[in-house]
Regions:
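Short, flexible loop segments at the rims of nucleotide/cofactor-binding pockets, characterized by
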Residues: 12-13, 88-93, 113-115, 173-175
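Short loop/helix-cap segments at secondary-structure boundaries that form the rim of catalytic
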Residues: 45-51, 126-131, 232-234
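Short loop/turn motifs at secondary-structure junctions
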Residues: 31-32, 108
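GT-A fold catalytic core of metal-dependent nucleotide-sugar glycosyltransferases
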Residues: 58, 62, 92-149, 156-161
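Active-site-proximal specificity loops/subdomain of glycosyltransferases
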Residues: 47-107
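A glycosyltransferase accessory/donor-loop signature
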Residues: 1-22, 30-31, 37-40, 50-52, ...
Length: 266
Protein backbone atom coordinates (compact mmCIF):
# COMPACT_ATOMS: atom_id res chain seq x y z
CA UNK A 1 0.00 0.00 0.00
CA UNK A 2 2.99 2.31 -0.45
CA UNK A 3 1.40 3.96 -3.51
CA UNK A 4 -1.37 5.50 -1.41
CA UNK A 5 -1.84 8.96 0.06
CA UNK A 6 -4.24 11.37 1.64
CA UNK A 7 -4.94 14.41 -0.49
CA UNK A 8 -6.52 17.81 0.10
CA UNK A 9 -7.13 20.97 -1.90
CA UNK A 10 -5.64 24.31 -0.88
CA UNK A 11 -6.89 26.88 -3.35
CA UNK A 12 -6.65 30.10 -1.32
CA UNK A 13 -4.44 31.51 1.48
CA UNK A 14 -7.35 31.05 3.91
CA UNK A 15 -7.19 27.26 3.64
CA UNK A 16 -3.47 26.99 4.36
CA UNK A 17 -4.09 26.99 8.12
CA UNK A 18 -6.78 24.36 7.66
CA UNK A 19 -4.45 22.06 5.76
CA UNK A 20 -1.74 22.54 8.40
CA UNK A 21 -4.17 21.43 11.13
CA UNK A 22 -5.24 18.48 8.98
CA UNK A 23 -1.61 17.37 8.60
CA UNK A 24 -1.06 17.72 12.36
CA UNK A 25 -4.12 15.55 12.97
CA UNK A 26 -2.86 12.83 10.61
CA UNK A 27 0.51 12.90 12.34
CA UNK A 28 -1.15 12.71 15.76
CA UNK A 29 -3.04 9.58 14.71
CA UNK A 30 0.22 8.03 13.43
CA UNK A 31 -0.85 7.74 9.81
CA UNK A 32 1.54 5.84 7.55
CA UNK A 33 0.63 7.90 4.48
CA UNK A 34 1.63 11.38 3.29
CA UNK A 35 -0.71 14.33 2.83
CA UNK A 36 -0.64 15.71 -0.70
CA UNK A 37 -1.79 19.31 -0.99
CA UNK A 38 -3.15 20.13 -4.44
CA UNK A 39 -2.36 23.81 -5.00
CA UNK A 40 -3.46 25.75 -8.11
CA UNK A 41 -0.82 28.18 -9.45
CA UNK A 42 -0.63 31.52 -7.59
CA UNK A 43 -3.43 30.56 -5.21
CA UNK A 44 -1.38 30.62 -1.99
CA UNK A 45 2.12 30.41 -0.55
CA UNK A 46 2.93 26.68 -0.24
CA UNK A 47 5.91 27.24 2.10
CA UNK A 48 3.91 26.79 5.37
CA UNK A 49 2.44 23.58 3.99
CA UNK A 50 5.87 22.20 3.13
CA UNK A 51 7.11 23.22 6.58
CA UNK A 52 4.28 21.18 8.12
CA UNK A 53 5.43 18.12 6.16
CA UNK A 54 2.88 18.21 3.33
CA UNK A 55 3.77 17.26 -0.23
CA UNK A 56 2.81 19.89 -2.82
CA UNK A 57 1.26 19.07 -6.16
CA UNK A 58 0.41 21.87 -8.56
CA UNK A 59 -2.97 21.35 -10.21
CA UNK A 60 -5.05 23.33 -12.64
CA UNK A 61 -8.68 24.38 -12.74
CA UNK A 62 -10.63 22.70 -15.55
CA UNK A 63 -11.29 24.96 -18.52
CA UNK A 64 -14.91 26.05 -18.24
CA UNK A 65 -17.18 27.72 -20.73
CA UNK A 66 -18.18 31.29 -19.98
CA UNK A 67 -21.74 30.12 -19.42
CA UNK A 68 -20.62 27.54 -16.85
CA UNK A 69 -18.59 30.18 -15.00
CA UNK A 70 -21.52 32.61 -14.92
CA UNK A 71 -23.81 29.96 -13.43
CA UNK A 72 -21.36 28.76 -10.78
CA UNK A 73 -19.52 31.86 -9.61
CA UNK A 74 -20.22 32.79 -6.01
CA UNK A 75 -22.91 35.45 -6.41
CA UNK A 76 -24.80 33.62 -9.14
CA UNK A 77 -24.77 30.27 -7.36
CA UNK A 78 -25.79 31.76 -4.02
CA UNK A 79 -28.72 33.58 -5.62
CA UNK A 80 -29.93 30.41 -7.32
CA UNK A 81 -29.16 27.97 -4.48
CA UNK A 82 -28.57 30.00 -1.30
CA UNK A 83 -26.87 28.50 1.73
CA UNK A 84 -29.73 28.92 4.19
CA UNK A 85 -28.50 26.50 6.88
CA UNK A 86 -25.25 28.26 7.71
CA UNK A 87 -22.88 30.90 6.38
CA UNK A 88 -19.97 30.34 4.04
CA UNK A 89 -16.93 32.56 4.70
CA UNK A 90 -16.17 35.36 2.28
CA UNK A 91 -13.11 33.52 0.96
CA UNK A 92 -15.23 30.60 -0.28
CA UNK A 93 -15.31 30.48 -4.10
CA UNK A 94 -17.62 27.72 -5.40
CA UNK A 95 -15.81 27.49 -8.74
CA UNK A 96 -12.60 26.54 -6.96
CA UNK A 97 -14.29 23.41 -5.63
CA UNK A 98 -14.01 21.78 -9.05
CA UNK A 99 -10.20 21.76 -8.72
CA UNK A 100 -10.80 18.77 -6.45
CA UNK A 101 -11.34 16.61 -9.54
CA UNK A 102 -7.67 16.99 -10.45
CA UNK A 103 -6.82 14.27 -7.94
CA UNK A 104 -7.87 11.70 -10.57
CA UNK A 105 -4.81 12.85 -12.53
CA UNK A 106 -2.42 11.81 -9.73
CA UNK A 107 -1.79 8.47 -11.41
CA UNK A 108 1.48 7.89 -9.57
CA UNK A 109 -0.81 6.65 -6.77
CA UNK A 110 -2.99 3.54 -6.74
CA UNK A 111 -5.45 4.83 -4.12
CA UNK A 112 -6.20 8.21 -2.60
CA UNK A 113 -8.39 9.31 0.27
CA UNK A 114 -9.51 12.88 -0.17
CA UNK A 115 -10.07 15.12 2.86
CA UNK A 116 -11.30 18.69 2.72
CA UNK A 117 -8.91 21.22 4.23
CA UNK A 118 -11.51 22.01 6.90
CA UNK A 119 -11.49 18.47 8.32
CA UNK A 120 -9.73 17.10 11.38
CA UNK A 121 -8.79 13.43 11.88
CA UNK A 122 -9.35 12.20 15.45
CA UNK A 123 -8.67 8.48 14.95
CA UNK A 124 -6.48 6.63 12.49
CA UNK A 125 -8.21 6.12 9.13
CA UNK A 126 -5.41 4.43 7.19
CA UNK A 127 -7.68 1.41 6.67
CA UNK A 128 -9.74 3.47 4.21
CA UNK A 129 -6.95 2.88 1.69
CA UNK A 130 -8.31 -0.68 1.41
CA UNK A 131 -11.79 0.54 0.49
CA UNK A 132 -12.98 0.66 -3.13
CA UNK A 133 -13.81 3.68 -5.23
CA UNK A 134 -16.11 5.54 -4.57
CA UNK A 135 -16.78 5.56 -0.80
CA UNK A 136 -18.18 8.60 0.99
CA UNK A 137 -20.16 9.38 4.13
CA UNK A 138 -23.67 10.88 4.12
CA UNK A 139 -24.44 14.59 4.14
CA UNK A 140 -25.88 14.29 7.63
CA UNK A 141 -26.16 17.50 9.63
CA UNK A 142 -29.79 18.64 9.93
CA UNK A 143 -32.15 15.66 9.76
CA UNK A 144 -32.08 12.01 8.75
CA UNK A 145 -32.84 12.87 5.14
CA UNK A 146 -29.12 13.60 4.87
CA UNK A 147 -28.46 9.86 4.73
CA UNK A 148 -29.66 9.91 1.10
CA UNK A 149 -26.95 12.32 -0.04
CA UNK A 150 -23.17 12.07 0.06
CA UNK A 151 -20.79 14.69 1.36
CA UNK A 152 -17.58 15.20 -0.62
CA UNK A 153 -15.48 16.23 2.38
CA UNK A 154 -14.03 12.72 2.48
CA UNK A 155 -14.02 10.03 -0.19
CA UNK A 156 -11.91 7.25 -1.68
CA UNK A 157 -10.63 7.48 -5.26
CA UNK A 158 -8.62 5.50 -7.78
CA UNK A 159 -6.62 7.91 -9.94
CA UNK A 160 -7.19 7.48 -13.66
CA UNK A 161 -6.71 9.87 -16.54
CA UNK A 162 -9.57 8.12 -18.36
CA UNK A 163 -11.90 8.78 -15.41
CA UNK A 164 -10.81 12.42 -15.32
CA UNK A 165 -11.54 12.88 -19.01
CA UNK A 166 -15.00 11.32 -18.59
CA UNK A 167 -15.62 13.75 -15.75
CA UNK A 168 -14.74 16.71 -17.93
CA UNK A 169 -17.12 15.46 -20.61
CA UNK A 170 -20.01 15.38 -18.15
CA UNK A 171 -19.09 18.42 -16.10
CA UNK A 172 -19.54 21.38 -18.45
CA UNK A 173 -22.60 20.78 -20.62
CA UNK A 174 -25.16 23.29 -21.91
CA UNK A 175 -27.59 24.28 -19.19
CA UNK A 176 -26.08 22.07 -16.48
CA UNK A 177 -26.11 23.43 -12.93
CA UNK A 178 -24.32 21.67 -10.07
CA UNK A 179 -26.17 23.02 -7.05
CA UNK A 180 -23.42 22.16 -4.57
CA UNK A 181 -20.59 22.14 -7.14
CA UNK A 182 -18.22 19.17 -6.80
CA UNK A 183 -20.47 17.41 -4.30
CA UNK A 184 -23.51 17.35 -6.55
CA UNK A 185 -21.37 16.42 -9.54
CA UNK A 186 -19.62 13.52 -7.81
CA UNK A 187 -22.89 12.03 -6.62
CA UNK A 188 -24.14 12.19 -10.20
CA UNK A 189 -20.92 10.70 -11.57
CA UNK A 190 -20.86 7.91 -8.95
CA UNK A 191 -24.60 7.21 -8.48
CA UNK A 192 -23.84 3.89 -6.76
CA UNK A 193 -21.42 5.39 -4.26
CA UNK A 194 -20.53 3.18 -1.30
CA UNK A 195 -21.79 4.59 1.99
CA UNK A 196 -19.34 5.03 4.84
CA UNK A 197 -20.60 5.49 8.41
CA UNK A 198 -21.14 9.16 9.21
CA UNK A 199 -18.41 8.97 11.86
CA UNK A 200 -15.85 9.18 9.03
CA UNK A 201 -17.10 12.64 8.07
CA UNK A 202 -19.02 14.02 11.04
CA UNK A 203 -20.31 17.43 9.95
CA UNK A 204 -20.08 19.97 12.73
CA UNK A 205 -23.77 20.92 12.52
CA UNK A 206 -24.57 17.34 13.54
CA UNK A 207 -23.27 18.40 16.96
CA UNK A 208 -25.95 21.12 17.05
CA UNK A 209 -28.91 19.52 15.30
CA UNK A 210 -28.67 15.78 16.05
CA UNK A 211 -26.66 15.62 19.29
CA UNK A 212 -27.83 12.06 19.99
CA UNK A 213 -25.69 10.95 17.01
CA UNK A 214 -22.60 12.87 18.13
CA UNK A 215 -20.61 10.17 19.92
CA UNK A 216 -17.14 11.44 20.76
CA UNK A 217 -15.79 7.95 21.42
CA UNK A 218 -16.48 6.80 17.85
CA UNK A 219 -16.00 9.86 15.61
CA UNK A 220 -13.00 9.50 13.31
CA UNK A 221 -13.17 12.75 11.30
CA UNK A 222 -14.80 16.10 12.07
CA UNK A 223 -15.73 18.27 9.11
CA UNK A 224 -16.09 21.98 9.87
CA UNK A 225 -18.62 22.70 7.13
CA UNK A 226 -19.95 26.25 6.78
CA UNK A 227 -18.15 28.41 9.36
CA UNK A 228 -14.45 27.62 9.85
CA UNK A 229 -12.82 27.17 13.27
CA UNK A 230 -10.04 29.61 12.44
CA UNK A 231 -12.48 32.43 11.66
CA UNK A 232 -12.18 35.01 14.43
CA UNK A 233 -15.88 35.78 14.54
CA UNK A 234 -18.98 34.03 13.30
CA UNK A 235 -22.50 33.54 14.57
CA UNK A 236 -21.99 30.05 16.00
CA UNK A 237 -18.72 30.53 17.89
CA UNK A 238 -20.27 29.87 21.29
CA UNK A 239 -22.45 26.96 20.19
CA UNK A 240 -19.52 25.21 18.52
CA UNK A 241 -16.93 26.12 21.15
CA UNK A 242 -15.93 22.52 22.12
CA UNK A 243 -15.27 21.70 18.45
CA UNK A 244 -13.41 24.95 17.85
CA UNK A 245 -11.26 24.51 20.96
CA UNK A 246 -10.40 20.98 19.83
CA UNK A 247 -9.35 22.22 16.38
CA UNK A 248 -7.05 24.85 17.91
CA UNK A 249 -5.51 22.29 20.26
CA UNK A 250 -4.59 20.09 17.27
CA UNK A 251 -3.35 23.02 15.22
CA UNK A 252 -1.15 24.23 18.09
CA UNK A 253 0.18 20.72 18.76
CA UNK A 254 -1.31 20.30 22.22
CA UNK A 255 -2.20 16.85 23.58
CA UNK A 256 -5.91 16.24 23.02
CA UNK A 257 -6.21 12.72 24.44
CA UNK A 258 -7.47 13.95 27.81
CA UNK A 259 -9.79 16.45 26.13
CA UNK A 260 -11.35 13.71 23.99
CA UNK A 261 -11.86 11.49 27.03
CA UNK A 262 -13.53 14.34 28.90
CA UNK A 263 -15.74 15.19 25.93
CA UNK A 264 -16.77 11.53 25.57
CA UNK A 265 -17.86 11.48 29.22
CA UNK A 266 -19.78 14.77 28.99
Amino acid sequence: MSRCAFVTLVNSPDYVIGAQALKHSLDRTVSAYPLICMVPPNSCDPAPLEAAGCKIKEVYTPRFSDEFIRRHKRDSLHRRAPFDKGSKPAFHDPLNNFCKLALWQLTQFDKLVFLDADTLVLRNIDHLMNYPEFCAAPNLYEDLDGFHRMNSGLFTAVPSEATYQKMLEQLDRPGVFWRRTDQTFLQSFFPRWHGLPYIYNALQYLYLNLPQLWQWDSIHVIHYQYEKPWQKQHSKVEKLKPLIDLWWAVYEGRDIAVDLDELARA
